[in-house]
Structures are given as C-alpha cells and as structure tokens.
C-alpha cells in the first residue's frame, strides 16, 4: 500500500464526494466545528462518570440524552447496556445485488477499574477511569451521528452506529453480534469501521495498515500440583512453586527458539500464586499466561504446543499439571481495500501528512476483531496527546495518568461521518 504521505498534501472540501449520479452531500469542517463545544461537554460528562463492564446505565443515558429528537431507530441491548442506532438514508439505492447498502461505525463505551490520577477538573473519583479513551470513542460516534443526520436526505444507504459496552475483557462486541448488530439495518452491513484514540500519539494524526493490525489474545491457566510438606524438609514433598518458577523461564526459552520472530508469539506470565506461609511448601501453585499472536498458524501452534510443553516439564519433576487453554480474541485483520480507504479518506479531509501507514501490527488485542471476522472493514488509531505536552511526559493508554485531549473530537466525528458517507456512495455505484 502506498502511503498517503507520499501523495499531494492538498485536500478537498469536506463536503465533496467522488463523482456519482446521486446528489450526495456530506458534512463539512464548518459543520463539525458547530457541534464541537457540545461534544466536549458530552465527553467530559462521560469521563467523570466512567463505568466498567457490560452494565453502563449512566453512560447509556448520557448517549440517549445526546441523540434525543433525532430521526433514528434505537435498540437497547438485552442484558447489556449497548445501543444500536440505525440512520436511514433519504436516497436509499439498491446495489448490483439488489440490496440497499449499510455501513457500520463502532464506538466502545466502557472504562477500566483504575483510580484516576490525571489532575483533570473533570476526573472520575469512583475508582473507575476512562484510561483507554473510550469516552472519546463514544463522543466521536455521537458526533458522527449528528453530522450524518443533518445530511441524511442525501445518503444512498443506511448507517448502523454500534455503541458497545464491555470491550475491556467482556467481549461486548461478540455479545452485540449475537444480538444482531450486523443485521440491524435489515441486510448485513457491507463494511465496518472503528478508531481508537492514543494518549501518547500526536494530536490529530491517524494510523492504519493493511492486513494484520492487532494481535489475537489467548489465555493459558496452569495449576501445578505437588505434595505439601514442611519447608525445612523439601525432600519429603514435591515443590510446586519451584517447578512453577522453572516454567516461567522455560516457556520464554521455548518461544524464542521455536517460533519465528517475523511471525511472533509473545507470552507473559502475569499471575503466579502459591503458598500461604513461609514455612510451608504448598500442595499447588497457579500461573496464568497471556499469549499474543498475529497469525492463525501461530495461534494454532501455540494452543497445541504450549500446554504439551507445560505438562511434560512438570511431569519430568514428578508433579502433575492441569492446563486450561482459552482462545479469547482473534487477531484484528484489516481488509486491504478498506485500510487504503481509511487512510485515503483521512488524508483527503485533513492532509496526507496526518495519515500514516503503521509499519508493524500492534501487540494489544481488540474485540472489534469479532466484527472484522465477518464484515470487510478497517480499524485504526487516532492521536489525542495533549497539545504542547512533551513526548517524554505522555502516558500511554491504561495508565492512571493517561491524559486524552478532547481537541480532536470534531475531526474524529467528521472522519467517521465521511467513512460511512463515502463508503455508501461507492457501494451505491457497484
């Protein structure tokens, strides 16, 4: 994929769309500026009231209040605080397959169980925090809805807005798919897009890439069962802590010698618990390992080989291992054409110098991967570092000191609106 930064840095009026027989109007930068203050107010209310998990009643109400009065179809989730909003276009046009196209835009809404230490005057005080910037995702999606609503009469198809709880470890995307979000407009959506803000990346710069974008996440839980005894007489027992400690090193050594660095496997022993007293060798120890992979081949190999390695190593020391291996999330894979479209649209709106092709995938994981497994689309990042904050003082997402600027909200909303509107224009011509 050629980088937009290699092209002419001039960009077009935000309302223009590629030539089409349809009279399509999309929002302008002036339209986005008109709603900017309201977006900042909403973002700060969401931030101050951060909630965790699948049940986000305050967040859901703030969104509903923000979109009240719009000519839209709203469906609340069953058992989770999701919202699915459908905006019907006024020039709904069947494509070559006889289907009125629909495009999905997604914004996740949940926070993290992190006590906030940003110093913001709108900081949350509940022990929960929007440390990953999902308050901006939610607000940007509300902004895109409001902008497209103004121009709904010219849209040649429908837009589905996916307000998702439970991204942070609750598989909210999977649950919304089970409840039918991909088919909310009637026929299945033809494309899906999402963006994630980054507190440590330059304000107003977008990042994307073709193909593998974020890692798959698997979890391996290990119980090493030994034989407890007095700490002064280890030979009369079987020490699970010593064997567990050996596993930590052996797992890393195995990965570095058996897996290709150009199709990487990254593992981390994030939990290691065993024992209740310093003078007792316990009966068991427990380890939990996170496993990150970028390809189906390595994901499958890791699932087959790592539990076998653990079982054999533990048995060699005369102990037993119980291993539970769970695939939690698939990799986030961008469609090549949609990744190109993502960056081309951003470059056209804001200049090619602000649209960057990521050279490598991101080792974190994301449940929007569930959507991209079923629908072609693209996921990217958007920098929201505080203006004039030195790079060395920027804290990354998930830090209690991660400070996300809301100065890019209008651009974020405009970009999402154009992703949907321009994609509908293309689909209507196919």
Describe these PLM feature segments.
Residues 4-13, 18-130, 135, 139-155:
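Acidic/His- and Gly-rich active-site-bordering loop/insert found
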Residues 104-106, 196, 220-222, 379-385:
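Non-cysteine beta-strand/loop elements that form the S-adenosyl-L-methionine
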Residues 2-4, 18-21, 242-430:
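Metal-dependent amide/peptide-bond hydrolase catalytic core
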Residues 92-93, 112-129, 135-136, 148, ...:
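Histidine/acidic-residue-rich, glycine-tolerant segments that coordinate divalent metal ions
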């Amino acid at each position: 994929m050629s980088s937009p930064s290699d092209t002419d840095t001039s960009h077009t009026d935000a309302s223009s769309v590629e030539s089409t027989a349809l009279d399509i109007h999309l929002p302008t930068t002036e339209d986005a500026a008109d709603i900017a203050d309201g977006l900042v107010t909403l973002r700060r209310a969401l931030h101050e009231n951060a909630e965790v998990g699948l049940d986000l009643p305050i967040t859901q109400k703030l969104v509903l209040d923000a979109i009240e009065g719009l000519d839209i179809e709203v469906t609340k989730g069953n058992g989770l605080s999701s919202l699915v909003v459908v905006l019907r276009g006024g020039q709904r046009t069947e494509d070559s397959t006889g289907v009125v196209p629909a495009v999905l835009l997604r914004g996740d809404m949940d926070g993290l169980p992190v006590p906030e230490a940003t110093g913001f005057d709108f900081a949350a005080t509940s022990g929960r925090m929007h440390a990953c910037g999902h308050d901006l995702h939610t607000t940007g999606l509300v902004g895109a809805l409001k902008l497209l609503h103004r121009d709904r009469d010219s849209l040649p198809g429908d837009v589905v807005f996916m307000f998702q709880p439970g991204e942070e470890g609750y598989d909210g995307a999977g649950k919304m798919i089970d409840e039918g979000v991909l088919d909310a407009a009637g026929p299945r959506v033809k494309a899906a897009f999402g963006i994630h803000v980054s507190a440590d990346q330059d304000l107003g710069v977008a990042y994307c890439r073709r193909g593998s974008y974020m890692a798959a996440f698997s979890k391996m839980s290990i119980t090493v069962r030994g034989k407890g005894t007095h700490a002064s007489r280890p030979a009369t027992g079987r020490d699970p802590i010593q064997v567990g400690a050996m596993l930590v090193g052996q797992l890393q050594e195995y990965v570095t010698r058996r897996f290709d660095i150009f199709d990487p496997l990254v593992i981390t022993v994030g939990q290691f618990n065993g024992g209740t007293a310093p003078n007792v060798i316990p009966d068991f120890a427990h380890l939990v390992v996170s496993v990150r992979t970028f390809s189906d081949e390595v994901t499958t190999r890791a699932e087959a080989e790592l539990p076998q390695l653990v079982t054999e190593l533990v048995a060699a020391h005369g102990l037993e291992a119980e291993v539970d291996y769970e695939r939690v999330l698939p990799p986030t894979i961008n469609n090549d054409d949609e990744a190109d479209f993502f960056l081309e649209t951003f470059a056209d709106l804001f200049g090619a110098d602000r649209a960057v092709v990521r050279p490598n995938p991101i080792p974190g994981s994301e449940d929007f991967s569930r959507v991209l497994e079923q629908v072609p689309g693209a996921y990217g990042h958007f920098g929201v570092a505080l203006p004039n904050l030195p790079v060395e003082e920027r804290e990354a997402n998930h830090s209690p000191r991660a400070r996300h600027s809301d100065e890019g909200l209008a651009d974020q909303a405009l970009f999402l609106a154009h992703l949907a509107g321009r994609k509908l224009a293309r689909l209507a011509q196919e």
